């Protein structure tokens, strides 16, 4: 969703399509907390009902996951999405078994871009930063891993708050950029 469901609902109620939290903060709410709470509950219900409606894996993802599993490479999935949506989605896509560890946005005190999720994943897998790489499609992924001392690979597709991750190089710099996930296997 980009900045999370709460920000999406606030933008919808404020009729703001910019998605910029600082921009939103400049304007008083034109709705009260009760309206927001109700709208957010409706959003979550509909989202849960349609969780897999327009969701699929990018080309090459399944073959990369299978190849990494065949090499006994441990994987951790780190997402800012809440656990109640993440686990059913991974199961529906048939990829939950590839991950030794899944960290969701509501599991820890801080979400990406804070380094805590990456540091926790390293600890959970009993590896150090030098033994790991973060593959991500957003500035939050790259910033989180970089702050944790982990090398980064940025995929140039996916969702990065509506902008190309290659255009975000002023905000953060990945170690490597790839256009296809299968390039990880080369």
Predicted regions and their residues:
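Conserved short hydrophobic patches within well-ordered secondary structure
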Residues: 1, 40-43, 51, 78, ...
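Asp-based, Mg2+/Mn2+-dependent phosphohydrolase catalytic module
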Residues: 20, 66-70, 83, 87-186
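Gly/Ser/Thr-rich helix-start
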Residues: 3-5, 61, 77, 106, ...
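Short linear motifs at secondary-structure transitions and domain/linker junctions
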Residues: 31-33, 50-51, 77-79, 127-129, ...
């Amino acid at each position: 969703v980009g900045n999370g469901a709460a920000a999406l609902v606030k933008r919808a109620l404020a009729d703001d399509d910019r998605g910029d939290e600082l921009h939103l903060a400049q304007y008083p709410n034109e709705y009260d907390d009760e309206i927001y709470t109700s709208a957010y509950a409706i959003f979550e219900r509909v989202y849960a009902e349609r969780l897999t409606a327009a969701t699929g894996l990018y080309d090459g993802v399944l073959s990369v996951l299978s190849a990494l599993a065949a090499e006994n490479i441990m994987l951790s999935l780190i997402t800012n999405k809440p656990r109640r949506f993440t686990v059913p989605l991974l199961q529906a896509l048939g990829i939950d078994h590839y991950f030794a560890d899944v960290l969701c946005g509501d599991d820890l005190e801080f979400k990406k871009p804070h380094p805590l999720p990456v540091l926790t994943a390293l600890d959970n897998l009993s590896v150090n930063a030098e033994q790991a790489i973060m593959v991500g499609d957003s500035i939050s992924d790259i910033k989180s891993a970089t702050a944790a001392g982990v090398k980064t690979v940025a995929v140039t597709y996916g969702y990065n708050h509506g902008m190309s991750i290659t255009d975000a190089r002023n905000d953060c710099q990945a170690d490597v950029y790839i256009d296809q996930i299968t390039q990880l296997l080369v």
